[in-house]
Amino acid sequence: MDRLIISPSPHIHSGDSVERNMYAVLIALAPACLVSLVTFGLGAFIVLAVSVLACVLTEWVITKYLYKQPSTIGDGSAILTGLLLGMNLPSSLPWWIIVIGAIVAIGVGKMSFGGLGGNIFNPALVGRVFLLIAYPAQMTLWPKAGQYFSYTDAVTSATPL
């Protein structure tokens, strides 16, 4: 070993592809998504669905019309970004704010740095931070968890007795 060989990462390789890793993370997040749906109801489903659809559509538009390259939505990274963004947002958030967050997450947080693997920050968190700065009132208004249950499990405050 007389020479120092410098090459771009990754330096350790496995048989897993990017697509396989992305979909494995999506499967791992499925239980958390189900719990959020049970806890926050239809609002959580709408936020997750709008976020995922907006992220996938934004990535498709940017790769097709701005970069003029084949679409990269098949790798699952836009779906994962949309899911992570949706899980970071209140379930009562209006759909148009979610779309703005998805556009910022994919457009600014991911694609402006060259796409998958080139971003310096997590794109979903870039979208969340932007929304928190742009819409602080809506982003800090969280609905009561478990309001869809018809019973009270415990009371943790003073009672009239």
Regions found by a protein language model. Give the residues of each.
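N-terminal signal-anchor module of multipass membrane proteins
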Residues: 1-56, 60
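C-terminal ends of transmembrane helices
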Residues: 9, 57-69, 106-117
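Short, amphipathic, aromatic/basic-enriched membrane-interface segments that mark the entry/exit
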Residues: 12-22, 63-74, 91-93
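Hydrophobic, membrane-inserted alpha-helices
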Residues: 28-35, 59, 78-86, 102-106
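Transmembrane helix interruption/hinge and helix-loop junction motifs
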Residues: 38-45, 89-98
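Hydrophobic core segments of alpha-helical transmembrane domains in multi-pass membrane proteins
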Residues: 47-54, 97-105
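Cytoplasmic-side transmembrane-helix entry/capping segments in multi-pass membrane proteins
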Residues: 70-80, 97-103, 118-129
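Long hydrophobic alpha-helical segments that form multi-pass transmembrane helix bundles
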Residues: 117-161
